[in-house]
């Protein structure tokens, strides 16, 4: 079977709360239009024909997910997530069956464009390690003095990228790297960092900068603008 026809399973870690949003409702359950942020994020994945299944890792005490139409979607599976993102991703990988390649996507990143997703998925034809959507840094970057709100120095932005999601890897490779990194006490901030820890160098696939993660209150209005405009 050609690599371009291989089915892909997506894992969405959605067990976090997101305290920076300053709401009692977890950010993934805030609404934009008639859908929650989580629903926008998941439907963007399922819109691609290669993504045949999505595993969502939620908090064991989550009572909101069952109320969503998404809970009855035939291509959606739900598992209990963990205390940390990496634990939730591992739980999702264990439920991914025999999928050779997996996407991992933030629950609160609802503005994914199909062109970006298609270019990321094409890595299964050319790469053995996969890669991530990312955006080149365009702003001037400053390093702060340790523990102070004062500039230590300007950071050279050449070759700096903002890591986005989805991130796309062979399932077994990601599982092994995440497991090893956690067992050895490494700091894992995203899935690519687990592969980096194990000596791999995932590819950077340039994506649109409007593929934002809803993290702070002002992000909600921006995401709504991006989702409702026609481009």
Curated annotation (Swiss-Prot):
It comes from Citrobacter koseri (strain ATCC BAA-895 / CDC 4225-83 / SGSC4696). GO terms for molecular function: 2-C-methyl-D-erythritol 4-phosphate cytidylyltransferase activity. Pathway: Isoprenoid biosynthesis; isopentenyl diphosphate biosynthesis via DXP pathway; isopentenyl diphosphate from 1-deoxy-D-xylulose 5-phosphate: step 2/6. Keywords: Isoprene biosynthesis, Nucleotidyltransferase, Transferase. Its EC number is 2.7.7.60. The record marks 157, 213 as: Positions MEP for the nucleophilic attack. This is 2-C-methyl-D-erythritol 4-phosphate cytidylyltransferase. SUPFAM superfamilies: Nucleotide-diphospho-sugar transferases. One of its GO terms (biological process) is isopentenyl diphosphate biosynthetic process, methylerythritol 4-phosphate pathway. The keyword Protease does not apply. InterPro entries: IspD, IspD/TarI, IspD/TarI_cytidylyltransf_bact, ISPD_synthase_CS, Nucleotide-diphossugar_trans. Homodimer.
